[in-house]
Amino acid sequence: MKYFISATPGPMPPTPEQFDTAIEWLEGRVDDGTFDCVYGFLEGGGFGITNADSHREALDLMAEYPLFGMVTWEVRPLLEFKEGLDTVRAKLAEAQSAMAG
């Protein structure tokens, strides 16, 4: 299962050493395939696409991040492109029929 995991810096900036440790940690997770990719935001922070077998595994991964308590997290489970489209389309058709009366 893939997850979008975003970290936004909090009000307390890390030390340069903490920052370096976090970057090394991210590089290691990209190198070992834990993250498919990692991108930064212009204003600070960034996101990655990770592979985890469960929500708990995604949480455990986040808790390992050296700046865990210094960032605000956003986590979203992802679907493969077109996965579930049949369900969405069926619900749209159902709603359209209901509106037509």
Predicted regions and their residues:
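Conserved, structured core segments of small domains
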Residues: 1-101
